[in-house]
């Protein structure tokens, strides 16, 4: 688990580096599916003092199996997503400014251009709000459930992120670093969409044929972007 703990530590340290986290906000996790264990950031520990050894290992029920600290308060959300979507290898939650603004507005981040289409196949959805009963009950677990409710049976790696109404963004990927990469992109396209709609409030979505081209050339069966 030491290698995975190091990877998760490095991915968490990318959050303040890319301007996605202030103070102790944000958390990254990764899963070892063979062992059924998840490594996640400890709750409330400052990035300035955090070490790889501080990462917390939990089983799929949330029980701590390794680590001196309590795991992130969002652990139950991460675990629910891992249970539902086997393709996920890493998950990140932030309160990055522009993506969170769309979450607070209760709006999906619209697909307006090719930067968005390179990573997200369509709008980045916004969940419904949680009921008072859902918040007062198992809040973090129910946050995971409302994300799953919104995504349904869609392949999560085709839209590797979501904004939770009145809360903030979650992103995911093949591993922890990929999840952070997608979170960075989500913040950038959220900012671009806000600026573009400010310039032209009547702006429509990207043409579907252009979106399809950009997404498929990176992620489709005949993808040709980048090096083999």
From Swiss-Prot:
Pathway the protein acts in: Cofactor degradation; L-ascorbate degradation; D-xylulose 5-phosphate from L-ascorbate: step 4/4
Enzyme class: isomerase
GO BP, one annotated term: pentose catabolic process
Pfam assignment, any one: Aldolase_II
EC number(s) recorded for this UniProt protein: 5.1.3.4
Catalytic activity: L-ribulose 5-phosphate = D-xylulose 5-phosphate
Binding site for substrate: 26-27, 43-44, 72-73
Protein name per UniProt: L-ribulose-5-phosphate 4-epimerase UlaF
Gene: ulaF
């Amino acid at each position: 688990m030491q290698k995975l703990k190091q990877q998760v530590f490095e991915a968490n340290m990318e959050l303040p580096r890319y301007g996605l986290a202030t103070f102790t906000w944000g958390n990254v996790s990764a899963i070892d599916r063979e062992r059924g264990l998840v490594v996640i950031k400890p709750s409330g520990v400052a990035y300035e003092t955090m070490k790889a050894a501080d990462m917390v290992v939990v089983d799929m029920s949330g029980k701590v199996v390794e680590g001196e600290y309590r795991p992130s308060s969002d652990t139950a959300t991460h675990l629910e997503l891992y249970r539902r979507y086997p393709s996920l290898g890493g998950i990140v939650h932030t309160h990055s400014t522009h993506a969170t603004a769309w979450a607070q507005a209760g709006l999906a981040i619209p697909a307006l251009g090719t930067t968005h289409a390179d990573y997200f196949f369509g709008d980045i959805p916004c969940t419904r709000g949680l009921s008072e009963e859902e918040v007062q009950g198992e809040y973090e677990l129910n946050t995971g459930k409302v994300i799953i409710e919104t995504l349904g049976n869609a392949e999560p790696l085709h839209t590797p992120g979501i904004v939770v109404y009145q809360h903030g963004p979650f992103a995911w990927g093949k591993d922890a670093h990929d999840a952070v990469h997608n979170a960075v992109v989500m913040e950038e396209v959220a900012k671009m969409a806000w600026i573009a709609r400010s310039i032209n409030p009547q702006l429509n979505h990207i043409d579907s044929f252009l979106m399809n081209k950009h997404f498929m050339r990176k992620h489709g069966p005949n993808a040709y972007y980048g090096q083999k």
